[in-house]
A protein has these predicted regions:
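Flexible, low-hydrophobicity surface segments
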Residues: 1-159, 178, 257
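Glycine-rich loop/linker segments at domain edges
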Residues: 16-22, 85-86, 155-198, 290-375, ...
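Alpha-helical support elements that line or immediately flank enzyme active sites
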Residues: 42-72, 108-128, 198-268, 325-334, ...
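Amphipathic alpha-helical
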Residues: 67-80, 160, 411-441, 448, ...
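Short acidic, glycine/serine/threonine-rich loops at helix termini
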Residues: 79-84, 121-124, 191, 213, ...
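Glycine-rich and small/hydrophobic secondary-structure elements
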Residues: 88-112, 116-117, 248-301, 358-383, ...
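Non-catalytic terminal/interface segments that mediate subunit docking, oligomerization
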Residues: 197-203, 207-209, 215, 224, ...
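Beta-strand segments within the central parallel beta-sheet cores of soluble alpha/beta enzyme folds
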Residues: 235-242, 269-279, 306-311, 341, ...
Length: 502
């Protein structure tokens, strides 16, 4: 068993509070004015699914102070689609091109002298739509008569993986008790104090595009934005401000706007600034994936779990956008949580619907996993007439088993799960709660007690990327190497001698 840490479980004094509380933070909107910068407003689709028939930009361009308009037609001509980690031919651009596939999808950008003019001018821009049938449920999206979002794909199934560890069929054949349950995990969002922000400046003489943005983890997406805009990596500069006003994972999905505002700067020839407003953020920034899942548990009558089967349908919205399908696979190493069962089958479907796009958000994928697993632990306890805490205790990895290798490849280096559970029960006065629950229920009152155990991945070293990607993508340089270290550097030299340092 590994030595206890001198840091874990200890109060650590915060060092940033004084600077932030006295107004000395430096966020994207505080960036020193870029000379001759103009402001952008984004026109968004009011339809969940609609074919774009055309644009009328004359009234917008005629307004005083308007510098230019970028439409989906311009995006289609000037940009390549973003790379995605599946083989399905899904063409995801910085804005809608042929059709809009979710409410709030960008369809045009208006650049003007200030944000007020840009917003007013955007109201005068006319987009002609042909509304189409929409589908928002991931199971219904796979039915034969469901509207197809991407005709080139021919289905709304963006990807599918089946992973088998150990001998799940043998575990279920041996089981004395089998339980099956359906779960629905809702789409969810977070609201950081600071919304998205992008400032882009194009230097036509040197061919250098500089982008300032409150992007969480910009280096991962640098090659993708470079490819989309056709700007060499060594000519594309990403600069992150000293402070970011919250993210919860959401700001890792800002990169389509880096490309869109970058294109606006390149097309108009002036620096362009865009700060997302709260309505835009709530409508179309990035949300957590909603899921429909089926779980099966094979167990003995004493509560010992022999194996599980996972089957889920993850709803990624109108397109699959990197780092999706990470929601299905980020917790791969800890699929079994703190429990010692060795047999597992995972059947994961990634489905496109006419909802807004998804990405990292508040624990990215882990909430789904814990909700389902812990729900099954409670149902097993109820089936067997055992206390929910006791069922969990009987299946925990013991301290003397650590370090422990999970069947899915995770490595648990240290911990004492039984002790941690007991500490939580003692602090909550669990036995007293159960007695109070019994009394309340005898009186006809509701009295619930919830338990949940989790082993949460922190630095994953990006190992789940190899699981999420189709095999032909796994060794490509834009995806690998990756480092899970808090600090790392990668230097690439291409055949022409151009150096890219990340």
């Amino acid at each position: 068993m590994a030595q206890a840490s001198q840091w874990i479980g200890k109060p650590i004094k915060r060092v940033e509070d004084a600077r932030l509380l006295t107004g000395r933070g430096a966020f994207i909107d505080d960036h020193p004015p870029v000379a001759n910068a103009r402001h952008a407003a984004i026109v968004r689709s009011p339809h969940a699914h609609a074919r774009i028939l055309g644009y009328d930009v004359a009234a917008t361009l005629a307004m005083p102070g308007v510098v230019g308009v970028i439409t989906g037609e311009d995006v289609a001509k000037a940009c390549k689609p973003f790379g995605v980690g599946v083989t399905a031919p899904i063409h995801y651009y910085p804005s809608a091109t042929d059709r809009a596939r979710f409410v709030g999808e960008p369809v045009a950008v208006v650049v003007a002298r200030d944000r007020y003019i840009a917003e007013d001018a955007a109201d005068h821009l006319v987009v002609r739509y042909e509304p189409l049938p929409a589908v928002v449920d991931p199971e219904k999206a796979l039915e034969p008569d469901a509207p197809i979002l991407h005709e080139a794909v021919g289905t709304n199934l963006a990807g599918h993986r089946r992973l088998v560890y150990g001998d799940p069929d043998g575990a279920f054949a041996e089981a004395e008790v089998v339980i099956r349950e359906r779960f629905r995990f809702p789409k969810y969002g977070s609201t950081p104090i600071e919304t998205y922000g992008v400032i882009a400046r194009w230097d036509g003489l040197d061919g250098v595009l500089t982008i300032w943005s409150n992007f969480m983890g910009p280096f991962i997406m640098h090659p993708l934005v470079s490819r989309v805009l056709g700007v060499p990596e060594n000519k594309l500069r990403f600069i992150v401000p000293p402070d970011i006003g919250g993210s919860f994972g959401i700001k890792s999905s800002i990169y389509p706007y880096l490309a869109l505002i970058g294109l606006a700067a390149m097309k108009t020839g002036v620096p362009v600034k865009w700060i997302e407003d709260r309505r835009e953020h709530l409508t179309a920034s990035s949300s957590g994936t909603d899921r429909v899942a089926w779980r099966e548990v094979a167990a003995r009558k004493d509560g010992t779990i022999l194996g599980m089967r996972f089957k889920w349908f993850d709803n990624v919205g109108g397109y699959i956008r990197s780092p999706e399908p990470g929601c299905s696979f980020r917790p791969t190493g800890n699929f079994v949580g703190p429990y010692r069962f060795k047999n597992l089958e995972v059947d994961a479907s990634i489905v496109m619907t006419n909802k807004s796009l998804t990405g990292p958000n508040r624990g990215y994928a882990c909430g789904h996993l814990y909700f389902e697993t812990e729900g099954m632990m409670d149902r097993l306890a109820e089936k067997l007439g055992l206390d929910p805490a006791e069922v969990r205790r009987r299946n925990l990895i013991a301290p003397d088993e650590l370090p422990y290798r999970t069947p899915t490849g995770g490595y648990y280096d240290s911990g004492d799960y039984p002790k941690t559970l007991q500490m939580a029960l003692d602090m909550a006065r669990y036995d007293e709660l159960r007695r109070a629950q019994k009394t309340a229920r005898a009186a006809g009152k509701y009295f619930g007690i919830g338990l949940a155990l989790a082993v949460d991945p922190s630095v994953s070293n990006m190992g789940y990327v190899a699981t999420a990607l189709d095999p032909q993508f796994r060794a490509k340089p834009e995806y690998l190497p990756k480092s899970g270290a808090t600090e790392s550097a990668t230097v690439k030299v291409d055949p022409l001698g151009r150096v890219i340092a990340i």
